[in-house]
């Protein structure tokens, strides 16, 4: 076997959409053309343009494009040659690198680049083919991702057409090749032109930016058309790997290792192989050898002699692995990974499979019925119940093809640092590259993985669409089957819920469009290729209606309104979070501003002020601000008194408080099983739902959620007659803990002190009640223990109290390697004490913390030599609080 990578330098040219693949010769003739002034297309005359547009056009045009974006947002290709492009990559990235367009996320540049979708894009690459390659049985062109509408021309001959960014292209092109120099031409369009003649079956709800319906016909990331949290950014390009593969003989083309059961220290596993033989009209004997290695040592070797036929063949073997090292989610144990290798020898020809990292672990989804008629919804790994803590993953960039591998590792590592155990792969995004799933397996992050359909009804009445849906489901379930991080496949995002709840007649379609995909094609593919991974037809799902709180995973957006069961208004009555009946919340969220460095980056030199249209363009629109401002005003301070810097600070704190509130509420419920925020990361810089922004900077809310998700956690809630204390231990270690509880005033006086000694089992939660005084106007209940953060009973109603003025100060700064250890202290209760350096991207092990009277707290500042400054974001009591007579001490 030989492989020829086609990654690297290509040539790129834009043409009008009506320049089809059949006209490739006239496009290629421009390869070495001399510069010629750009001309208007035939349907436009110069006098048709405004005076401003005429003046702009009559300037010396760009040698590659004449771009008129101020009004018409059109681009007219010139007759001058091609520009360089690096593949893999996106057309827009090449245009940025060649100075033709600006970075779309600065200022309001997304508005200027919409013309990119209106052109066809021609990519050209020459390559050499050897005689040895052509002597092989099969010579394939493999392209992992084509976005989107692709015509592939090899040496002037049309070789293939492809319309699915979610399914790799792989075709034998041997018949088109010859020894020596060959040429590959790929004509791409973004897919937009395919929308207009289609009959739409879809309605999209609540998006300010998205195309309302016909996006559903393009099997590419749906968010690129815009959503309620991102601008539309046209995408078009070649993603991930592109190569020519020449081979004869037999090779493993798919494999996995299933963990069937655990028996003490041993594990029963089953190897599965799909083997391709290149000669279609003969059989041949094959020696299949496969091994499992752990930490460099071989722990199992298997061998099979197979008689292969042409095309695909299958093999399995069930074995017992002695003293198996199990894979666990983050915080529950080690992420032990085995190296899985295999090779085939046929007629003396050896082909080795690319090694894979696999984990030995069992996984199940428990949906058993409870006595009250409701149902569980929790995951068990290796027989242990897992509380799924995490967030919704969206693509890392609107130009998703340009995301470097390092960004994936950073985001997964940051999730693990925040004690995440799960990402939900949102269905409006994409199936990520292999490195992402490798990092999730390495860091112990489970995946609730949507198939890539979202918030729309999909045209399953079209046979060509069903064909693509089936290919995609088969390809992705097979590709991802061996990763231990895969916890559940879900059919789509919110489509079942939309059918039952969103659309009244006559808007509601006459049937559930998409059911052939979500209820038949996808579950069959999962069962064939990954049978031990559960499948759920949609997210949310279960119950008579898809989003029933007492049945399965819920998307908790209904709690933004006055919910019929909890009877509370989101963000204003926080104690009612404890009454949410959900078992598993796989979406809920609140907005929070970014750090100032991020805002200044996309403002790109313009002034940071509320009325700056660039700021509004990046998510600061009125509907979002009304929610943020209302929450700040209710819980922290009067938002009208805040300048831009204060708004960034208090907005971030508010988001963190609300995320922590629901996280703690879900974790202390006996039936609580999961809490996934909407969203974890972002595809562009905006004021939004995330705790990590587009530039991979931690937002303020990151630290609040990290504390709420701690593997060892105390939670205390005021209740009738005192307080209820929850002790959570997700670690595999058992220990004895002395839990110190009581009442404390804001100035440090204590009362009703008690100590409860608990034997804390691994992977457990315990609760107990304490009787304490109930004057919560001047103080709070607390619980503390060695190895735990102190918990107090104050919710987010900070404006209901008059706190004493803080005297917080830095007591000590020590160097610890590349880090600083900073010890801070205050003599009074001090919420929201935080360290800051001149670089707001610096990482801390904790920040925006509560200081308890006279208790020092040491914070680690990572990779920092600059001594930070201590600040306090003091809450301001409301006018009603000020009027109340709370000035006398309870004592």
Label each region the model flagged.
Residues 1-104, 187, 194-205, 209-218, ...:
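Accessory carbohydrate-binding/adhesion or oligomerization-edge regions at the termini
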Residues 4, 11-17, 59, 63, ...:
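Accessory beta-strand-rich segments of carbohydrate-active enzymes
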Residues 11-20, 86, 223, 234-237, ...:
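Substrate-binding clefts and catalytic carboxylate motifs of secreted carbohydrate-active enzymes
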Residues 97-129, 134-142, 147-155, 160-163, ...:
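Active-site-adjacent substrate/metal-binding segments within catalytic domains
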Residues 175-183, 272-369:
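Extended acidic/polar, glycine-enriched regions
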Residues 305-325, 742-777, 841-866:
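Intrinsically disordered, low-complexity Pro/Gly/Ser/Thr-rich segments with frequent PxxP/GP/PP motifs
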Residues 334-335, 342, 346-354, 771-807, ...:
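Terminal connector regions
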Residues 442, 459-546, 696:
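Active-site neighborhood of glycoside hydrolase catalytic domains
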């Amino acid at each position: 076997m030989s492989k020829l990578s086609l990654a690297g330098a290509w040539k790129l040219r834009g043409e009008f959409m009506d320049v089809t693949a059949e006209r490739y010769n006239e496009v290629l003739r421009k390869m070495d053309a001399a510069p010629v002034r750009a001309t208007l297309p035939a349907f436009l005359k110069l006098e048709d343009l405004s005076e401003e547009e005429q003046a702009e056009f009559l300037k010396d045009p760009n040698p590659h494009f004449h771009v008129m974006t101020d009004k018409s947002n059109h681009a007219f290709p010139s007759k001058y040659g091609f520009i360089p492009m690096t593949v893999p990559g996106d057309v827009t990235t090449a245009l940025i690198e060649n100075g033709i367009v600006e970075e779309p996320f600065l200022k309001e540049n997304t508005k200027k680049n919409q013309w990119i979708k209106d052109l066809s894009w021609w990519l050209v690459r020459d390559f050499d083919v050897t005689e040895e390659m052509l002597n092989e049985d099969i010579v394939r062109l493999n392209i992992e991702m084509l976005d989107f509408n692709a015509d592939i021309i090899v040496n002037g001959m049309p070789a293939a057409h492809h319309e699915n960014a979610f399914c790799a292209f792989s075709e034998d092109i041997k018949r088109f090749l010859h020894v020596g120099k060959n040429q590959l031409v790929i004509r791409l369009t973004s897919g937009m032109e395919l929308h207009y003649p289609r009959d739409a079956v879809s309605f999209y709800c609540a998006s300010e930016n998205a195309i309302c319906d016909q996006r559903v016909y393009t099997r590419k990331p749906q968010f690129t058309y815009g959503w309620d949290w991102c601008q539309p950014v046209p995408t078009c390009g070649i993603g991930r790997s592109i190569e020519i593969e020449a081979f004869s003989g037999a090779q493993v083309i798919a494999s996995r290792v299933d963990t069937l059961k655990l028996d003490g220290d041993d594990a029963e596993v089953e190897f599965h192989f799909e083997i391709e033989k290149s000669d279609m009209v003969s059989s041949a004997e094959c020696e299949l050898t496969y091994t499992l290695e752990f930490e460099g040592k071989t722990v199992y070797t298997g061998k099979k002699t197979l008689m292969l036929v042409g095309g695909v063949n299958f093999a399995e073997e069930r074995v017992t692995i002695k003293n198996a090292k199990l894979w666990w989610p983050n915080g529950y144990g080690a992420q032990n990974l085995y190296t899985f290798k295999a090779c085939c020898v046929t007629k003396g020809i050896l082909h080795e499979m690319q090694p894979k990292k696999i984990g030995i672990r069992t996984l199940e989804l428990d949906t058993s019925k409870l006595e009250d008629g409701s149902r569980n919804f929790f995951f068990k790994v290796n027989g242990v119940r897992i509380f799924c803590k995490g967030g919704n993953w969206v693509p890392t960039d609107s130009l998703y093809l340009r995301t470097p591998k390092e960004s994936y590792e950073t985001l997964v590592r940051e999730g693990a640092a925040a004690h995440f155990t799960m990402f939900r792969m949102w269905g409006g995004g994409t199936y990520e590259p292999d490195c992402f799933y490798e990092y999730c397996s390495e860091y112990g992050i489970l995946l609730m993985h949507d198939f890539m359909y979202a918030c729309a009804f999909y045209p399953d009445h079209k046979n060509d669409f069903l064909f693509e849906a089936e290919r995609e489901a088969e390809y992705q379930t097979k590709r991802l089957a061996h990763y231990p991080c895969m916890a559940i496949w879900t059919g789509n995002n919110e489509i079942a819920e939309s059918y039952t709840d969103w659309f009244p007649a006559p808007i509601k379609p006459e049937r559930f469009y998409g059911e052939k995909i979500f209820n038949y094609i996808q579950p069959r593919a999962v069962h064939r290729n990954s049978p031990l991974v559960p499948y759920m037809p949609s997210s949310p799902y279960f119950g008579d209606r898809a989003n029933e709180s007492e049945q399965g995973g819920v998307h908790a957006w209904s709690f933004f309104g006055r919910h019929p069961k909890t009877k509370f208004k989101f963000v204003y009555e926080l104690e009612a979070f404890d009454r949410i009946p959900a078992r598993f919340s796989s979406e809920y969220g609140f907005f929070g501003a970014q750090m100032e460095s991020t805002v200044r980056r996309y403002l790109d030199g313009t002034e940071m002020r509320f009325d700056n249209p660039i700021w509004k363009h990046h998510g600061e629109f009125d509907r979002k601000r009304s929610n943020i401002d209302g929450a700040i005003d209710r819980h922290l301070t009067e938002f009208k008194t805040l300048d831009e810097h204060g708004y960034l600070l208090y907005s971030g704190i508010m988001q963190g408080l609300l995320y922590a509130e629901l996280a703690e509420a879900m974790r202390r419920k006996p039936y609580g099983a999961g809490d996934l925020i909407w969203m974890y990361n972002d595809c562009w810089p905006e004021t939004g739902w995330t705790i990590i922004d587009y530039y991979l900077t931690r937002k303020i809310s990151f630290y609040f959620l990290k504390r709420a998700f701690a593997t060892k956690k105390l939670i205390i809630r005021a209740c009738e007659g005192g307080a209820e204390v929850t002790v959570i231990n997700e670690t595999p270690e058992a220990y004895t803990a002395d839990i110190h509880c009581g009442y404390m005033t804001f100035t440090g006086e204590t009362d009703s002190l008690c100590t409860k000694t608990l034997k804390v089992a691994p992977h457990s939660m315990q609760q107990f009640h304490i009787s304490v005084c109930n004057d919560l106007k001047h103080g709070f209940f607390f619980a503390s223990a060695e190895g735990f953060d102190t918990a107090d009973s104050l919710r987010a109603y900070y404006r209901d109290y008059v706190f004493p003025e803080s005297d917080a100060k830095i007591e000590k700064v020590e160097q610890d390697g590349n880090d600083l250890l900073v010890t801070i202290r205050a003599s009074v209760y001090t919420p929201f004490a935080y360290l800051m350096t001149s670089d707001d991207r610096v990482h801390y092990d904790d920040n925006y913390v509560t200081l308890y009277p006279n208790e020092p707290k040491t914070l680690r500042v990572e990779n920092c030599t600059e001594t930070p400054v201590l600040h306090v974001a003091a809450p301001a009591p409301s006018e009603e609080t000020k009027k109340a007579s709370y000035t006398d001490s309870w004592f």
